Regions:
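N-terminal helix-turn-helix DNA-binding core of bacterial DNA-binding proteins
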Residues: 1-25
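Short linear capping/connector segments at secondary-structure termini
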Residues: 14-17, 47-49, 79-86, 119-120
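Residues in the helix-turn-helix
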Residues: 28
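Basic amphipathic alpha-helical segments that dock to polyanions
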Residues: 32-39
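Beta-hairpin "wing" of winged helix-turn-helix
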Residues: 41-54
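Conserved segment of winged-helix/HTH DNA-binding domains
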Residues: 58-81, 99-101
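C-terminal regulatory/oligomerization modules of transcriptional regulators
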Residues: 82-127
């Protein structure tokens, strides 16, 4: 997605092209592209000049959206959504607060921020 976001021409890119430029295995990209298309973060154009495109501007795609498509809901501990097996878990409150802060921070970081030529731009986003 970063490769597509950095393209000034906003033209479709094939997975083979992205694989070569990012040094990632094609089969890995095929799996990721399938999930990103299913979640409507990417679209595909068929044909000779076809390839993949972002469905929204990079400024409108948050890092948390991408991560949750690829990894599932973000959880700091496995028992986050269920009853803890410990009757009196001393750290559950800490993990819940950390989870909220992590989600909020990743929600504010966009794909455009990630590909920005100025990484210092991200520093104000992290409390």
């Amino acid at each position: 997605m970063a490769s597509l976001a950095k393209d000034p021409d906003k033209r479709p890119h094939s997975l083979s092209e992205i694989s070569a430029s990012c040094h990632l295995p094609l089969t890995f990209l095929e799996q990721i592209a399938f999930d990103l298309r299913k979640s409507q973060l990417l679209s595909a154009q068929r044909g000779r000049n076809g390839g993949y495109l972002l469905t929204r501007r990079p400024e409108m795609i948050s890092l948390v959206e991408i991560l949750e498509v690829l990894e599932g809901p973000l959880k700091t501990v496995p028992c986050q959504d269920s009853q803890c097996s410990l009757s009196d878990c001393a750290t559950r409150g800490f993990w819940e607060v950390l989870q909220r802060h992590l989600h909020k921070t990743l929600q504010r970081i966009t794909l455009a921020d990630l590909v920005s030529k100025n990484p210092r731009k991200l520093l104000p986003l992290v409390p």
